[in-house]
Amino acid sequence: APAMTAEIFRLNSLGFIGNKEVSSRLAVTCRHASVLMASVCKAKGIPCRCRAGFIDFQHNGSVCGDHWINQIWNEQENRWINVDASGYYEYENRFGFSQYDIPNEKFSFSAQAWLDIRSGKVNGEKFVYQDAKGTNGLEATLIYLFLDFHALMNHEIFYSFRPRYVYHGLEQISEVQFQ
């Protein structure tokens, strides 16, 4: 987050403002936007955490793509509110829900997705890691399980930081080892 903030101010000394020239904008992924949002909230004393999971942009539950969001604690409602800081909702009617209060049924947290696949409750192919390889199912969910686990510990690791067996060898893990 400090490096992103420094670059934002380097590109435009006014910092966080709207309607910037394209040359003054910082291109980031949903992960970067989530980390930056959490940093800003925490600096202002607002409880916030990053979460890595899968979102249903199609409205039918058939495909959920990998995505990072934030959860901001709402003291009045006594709940975590799911917020997407990455700005994909410029036309909220297109999605049918607000980026500032994403319904829980639209975002699948990695741990629940993992458990649902393993129990046979859902077809794992619907959870897709958008890596140009079509990675889905348990492999995609396991990748995001590690990312979300670290995010919950305030240690948001980069996409490629994961155990070696996740890259090659997941199919070699026995059912006993999974248990």
Go through each PLM region and give its residues.
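His-Asp-centered catalytic microenvironments across diverse enzyme cores
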Residues: 1, 10, 53-68, 72-179
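Secondary-structure boundary elements
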Residues: 1-24, 36
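Cysteine-centered nucleophilic/redox motifs
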Residues: 23-52, 70
